[in-house]
Amino acid sequence: MDISKKDWKLFRERLSGWQENYMEGLVKEYANFLNDDKKPASEKFWELEKRIKEDKRHPGVVMELKKSEVIWDIVHLIRLKVITYNDLSDFSDELQNEVKRILEMSR
């Protein structure tokens, strides 16, 4: 499916907000982890460093944008719970239907 210019533009506009929301959740998880008084500081430090190293590669944090991959990127973001299908309400029916079709195929 070729993505429309409108959907491509909307995806680029929305992605940063979706990523910001995802990272806000990560920061809260990190804060809860760091506030655990049962673990020594060194353990928390190294575990946090490992976690950040892994998380910074997550599509909820950073993505390479290619117009030809938008449908798959959206499906991936939904599967990873960065966004929900409802976040696509302003996109074209064609894009929404294609995403829905792919998600249903892989259940």
Q: Which residues does each predicted region cover?
A:
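Acidic, Ser/Pro/Thr-rich low-complexity regulatory regions
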Residues: 1-107
